[in-house]
């Protein structure tokens, strides 16, 4: 299981597509299913529809959410290869009985379809390229700022490490947040 290219919960750690390609190769070599958790990285956030596309690989299982409904409604999907799907066909005891109270919500489904329509009609991914370059330039320019120790970006994701402590308890991030809120 990997978060392709951007480890969001680990502090926006960005790694190279080579790592993902090697992980795919190893999964193939040892006949292990590769699961890409694209909940954060999917829907163009890295500049491509799926972050795994940067490495030109396809996972066996892809998990998506958040951007699936434009972040407006709880909506998620788990996509699989035909090989995995075929494993659940046939006799009833082979079926994958999966369901819960909120499966197939009609409002969430309608919003997800509308998001896909907007992505295609407004060519969101093409616009993302220009925005990604602007974000990269903005974050790169911060490297010379006092208190900024590391910057990185990929697509719509930009992050920087601030000096003066480390981890979630450091107050530098809170000071930036407070200044940003004061500026609207």
Role assignments for model-derived ranges:
Residues 1-184:
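Conserved N-terminal phosphate-binding loop of PLP-dependent enzymes in the Aspartate aminotransferase
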């Amino acid at each position: 299981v990997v978060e392709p290219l951007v480890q969001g919960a680990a502090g926006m750690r960005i790694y190279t597509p080579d790592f993902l390609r090697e992980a795919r190769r190893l999964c193939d070599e040892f006949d292990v299913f590769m699961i890409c958790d694209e909940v954060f990285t999917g829907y163009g956030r890295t500049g491509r529809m799926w972050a795994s596309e940067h490495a030109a690989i396809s996972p066996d299982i892809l998990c998506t959410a958040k951007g699936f409904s434009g972040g407006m409604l709880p909506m998620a999907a788990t996509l699989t290869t035909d090989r995995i799907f075929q494993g659940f066909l046939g006799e009833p005891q082979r079926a994958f009985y999966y369901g819960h109270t909120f499966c197939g919500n009609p409002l969430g489904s309608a919003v997800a379809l509308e998001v896909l329509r907007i992505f295609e009609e407004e060519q969101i991914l093409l616009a993302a390229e220009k925005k990604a370059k602007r974000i990269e330039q903005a974050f790169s320019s911060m490297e010379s700022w006092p208190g900024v120790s590391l910057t990185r970006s990929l697509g719509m994701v930009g992050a920087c490490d601030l000096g003066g402590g480390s981890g979630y308890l450091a107050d530098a991030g809170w000071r930036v947040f407070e200044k940003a809120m004061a500026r609207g």
